[in-house]
Amino acid sequence: METDPVPTPSAISWNIQFHPLTTGVAISLIVTFVLIVCSALISGSEVAYFSLSPSEKHKISGRSNKKSFYINKNLESPEQLLATILVANNFVNVGIVILSSFTVDSIVDFTNEPILGFIVQVVIISFVILLFGEIIPKVYSTHHAMKFARLIAMPLHYTIKVLRPVNSILIYSTSFLN
């Protein structure tokens, strides 16, 4: 009698335990979702702002509404804009990783299956961040740069103001190295 050396997925018995969903975990899931949306907006803004054509920039400068004002202000210092986008996106992505790790640890006990725990916590979470926080927003904003720039103009303007001290250090260190 011959046996199959490779087990089928239904024959694999994972020794993991699930814990009940608590209020803290539910809040963590909601905040993680909000942070993924923030990551998407920040990532999309990078492509949107830096792919605006000169004619679109000229069109914006001729308008006198609030969104056009904020877009023009954001574009005044491309170094500050890029530094803000990079720093903010890193902060948000670190928050996503920390919260999702907490959430997974609170829901599932991978003590007896550390490799499966690694796959869930690192591979799947990285995939979610890349797909929903980076790739999809950048593809969308490539095709709708003006619309995306208008959507994120005011929040990005205030994010630039908040992160200016950190950005200044980043910009100074970059110019010092050059």
Q: Could you tell me what each predicted segment is?
A:
Residues M1-N178:
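Membrane-embedded alpha-helical segments of inner-membrane proteins
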